[in-house]
Amino acid sequence: MVIDVTNPLDFSNGMPPSLLPEYSNTWSLGEEIQKHLADAKVVKALNTITAKLMVDATLVNDANHNLFICGNDGDAKNTVKQLLADNFSWKAENILDLGDIKYARMTEGIVPFWVSVMQQQGTAMFNYLVVR
């Protein structure tokens, strides 16, 4: 199993970054990893937050915020959910499964926006919460 936390960001024009053109809208780095590691179970996770929050969900809003994951294998996604809950204080009900690995396009796509918010707020210690 591979947990993909990467983002295809282009900083060549400074901040905020843009997505590398080949990974915008119709393809993702998550899909590229799955393509090259065809036998692996790739789960895209943790790529929309700062590193400190990846390993301690309680640092923001007492862990009441969402984490997005996606991948082609349901068992692998469940394993990642359990790993995150058991080791990094993520609440299972706050981990939102978006579907198969093509949804990495969406999570990678919001990262330039995340960087803009981080710049405006002056901190990377924030996350998204889907309110229903």
Q: Language-model segments: which ranges?
A:
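Rossmann-fold NAD(P)-binding glycine/threonine-rich loop
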Residues: 3-59
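Active-site-lining helix/loop region of Rossmann-like oxidoreductase modules
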Residues: 53, 62-132
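A structural micro-motif
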Residues: 1, 40-41, 65, 93
